[in-house]
Amino acid sequence: MAARVCLVHYHEVGLKGKNRAHFEHILMDNIKAALAAFSVNAVSRISGYILVTFNEHQADEAARVIRTVPGVARVSLAYHTNRNPQEYCAAAVKALREFGPFESFKVHAKRSNTDYELTSIDINRQVGEVLCEAFPDKKVQMYDPDAMVHVLVVQ
């Protein structure tokens, strides 16, 4: 089952050299402090991002708070799933339904963990096919789409 999470992208903290982990931990501590009023399950580092999971459905409200933490570039509301294609395809449909009005979309898959058997192009096709079935009146548009569905395969 897909869990709603916040995927935190950060600024120049990621450019630091040997002390990068130290700065990432400081940023994680600052995020935890900012989210003291929320029921946070975990704040963890994954492949150049910080993942914040919750015990309750609080990701939408928490994203607004996380955006105010110094060092945070942006916060994406996301769904965390297993590597099961049915799970991540269902999460993609759910995410696109939540997007709001749109006429065109694009799928952009990225794998930082290359031990997964599907390539990024395979994932694009697989998720795109499911989205085309779920939204038959919407167009796939590679350049300047109204909505973009990102699929990240990490750790």
Where are these regions (language model features)?
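RNA-binding accessory domains that recognize and position tRNA/RNA substrates
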Residues: M1-Q155
